Amino acid sequence: MKSPKIKNNKMKQTDKTNSRENIEELEMLNIGMVGHIDHGKTTLLSKLTGKFADTHSEELKRGITIKLGYADTIIENSKGKKRYISFVDCPGHEMLMATMLSGAALIDAAILVIAANEGIKPQTKEHLIALKAKRVAQIIIIQNKIDLVTKEEAIKNYNDIKKFVKGTIAENSPVIPVSAQQNININKIKEILSELKIPERDTTSKPEFLIARSFDINKPGTKIENLHGGVLAGILKKGTLKIGDEIEIKPGIQEKHANQISYKSLKTKIVSIYRGTHPINKATPGGSLAFETELDNILTKSDSLSGTIASIPNTLPEITNKIKLKYSLFNEVLGEEKEIKIESLKLSEMIMLSVNTTTTVGKITRIKDNEIELSLNIPIVPLKGDSVGIARNIHNHWRLIGFGEII
């Protein structure tokens, strides 16, 4: 479905400080902001970028991140080295673990925020393991809110953090004392960000664009001739896409016929591409991206296409409700104050899976050794080798209990 009269009406550029060429030449990183609720992730992000990632009224009212927030910036270190950084602000609330896992699927490295006045919380542990499950190895630990504690308390908290990460993927990660509110050590964080390793990017394979958000950017009352098409936001996992390319989105939209639910893929054309507020001609892996398309906005408003995948038409696997995983479980439930031992998966058990930017619930239909087969409530695009977070409903909350890989 197409939106009327948008082909020559590209999204308005709001920041003209950099040309297309400059932006496309910069090294790019996706950084996840993770940690317990109210430890200062969003405030820290505002100091690093000059903007808040929370843009939803419900989030501003409640003071917590509910959906994934995004903020892009160009950082420059003391030697004049520049990088383009896309930050993904992941929810820290225990009931929003699925959204956090979706965010972890998008990132190259992470900033783990721990408040010095509160210390290590259950969600801190859960998020650290989630990063491991999503194969995120580069982590910067921020000891935030040092202005709220004494010197002795700060030293004790620092030692607690070092003890906490010993034996984990973050054992050798730097721990930076910070006060986001007072702008203490913000430049030190930027220095470290400028030196993180850039992952090897695959620009030659068929593209896989992971859609985390979708929007209608038109204001009420916009004249037809000024309408923009639906916007898709996320990251390009591999391949390249350029203005004018036709893309196919799967699973697409849900259709219901005679009480039977099916999914129909969507085909559209890329009208313009933005990295943050900067227009670019061609999208490559690294950094968050927004594609304006020819889709009718009714299909993209309110994140209705979040969790889908886009590529060149007829290149993605067929969607499926049946998948097979190789899996591994943790010893105990993370994110709980008291220890809860994780029991083995059971036949017919319902578990939640986080696959790239989507989540779905599935019923276990077969178990053999460390492999399971599931029947899913919502179909996925099965990309072999993709990491999958596994969660179980414990005390009415979905808790991360392990991870797997699509086989």
Where in this protein do the model-derived segments appear?
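P-loop NTPase switch module centered on the Walker A-proximal segment
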Residues: K10-A98, I107
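C-terminal effector modules of nucleic-acid-centric enzymes and ribosome-associated factors
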Residues: N30-M33, V149-K151, N297-I407
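Residue-level signature of catalytic and energy-coupling elements of molecular machines
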Residues: D38, L44, G63, D89, ...
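Conserved catalytic-core segments of large NTP-driven translation/proteostasis enzymes
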Residues: K163-D303, I309
